[in-house]
């Protein structure tokens, strides 16, 4: 599974986060998606103040799963048929090189993100949809 609306950035590259499903799990369950979301948030918390932030987490497996993180509360939200463009990104994640975190939002997503000291928050908009 991959996190499609949040990228980590260093001076030289963008890093997309992935969550590996155990090999014996060919059918994805809600538990697996929940584990992936918790993993992604555990990485994101290194760069932003979670208790002061509101943002969306969009996980892609065979479909998109969208969650709203609101100052400690995680809630699933309805998919609004937005797509998220593919970014050129490396999968090599090294937290020592990260300087910023980039959120992709849509017209339906309002966010408020507080970065930790030394990190930059970037936001871009992508309103592409499939019908």
UniProtKB/Swiss-Prot annotation:
Belongs to the chordopoxvirinae E11 family. InterPro entries: Virion_core. GO terms for cellular component: virion component. It comes from Fowlpox virus (strain NVSL) (FPV). The lineage of its organism: Viruses, Varidnaviria, Bamfordvirae, Nucleocytoviricota, Pokkesviricetes. Pfam families: Chordopox_E11. The keyword Glycoprotein does not apply. Its main location: virion. Keywords: Late protein, Virion. It is found in: Virion. Induction: Expressed in the late phase of the viral replicative cycle. This is Protein E11 homolog. The keyword rRNA-binding does not apply. It comes from the Viruses.
């Amino acid at each position: 599974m991959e996190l499609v609306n949040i990228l980590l950035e260093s001076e030289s590259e963008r890093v997309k986060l992935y969550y590996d499903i155990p090999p014996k799990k060919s059918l994805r369950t809600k538990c697996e998606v929940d584990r992936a979301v918790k993993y992604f948030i555990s990485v994101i918390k290194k760069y932003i103040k979670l208790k002061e932030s509101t943002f969306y987490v969009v996980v892609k497996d065979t479909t998109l799963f969208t969650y709203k993180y609101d100052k400690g509360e995680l809630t699933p939200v309805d998919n609004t048929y937005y797509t998220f463009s593919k970014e050129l990104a490396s999968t090599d994640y090294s937290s020592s090189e990260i300087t910023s975190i980039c959120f992709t939002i849509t017209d339906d997503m309002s966010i408020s993100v507080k970065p930790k000291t030394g990190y930059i928050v970037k936001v871009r908009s992508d309103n592409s949809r499939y019908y």
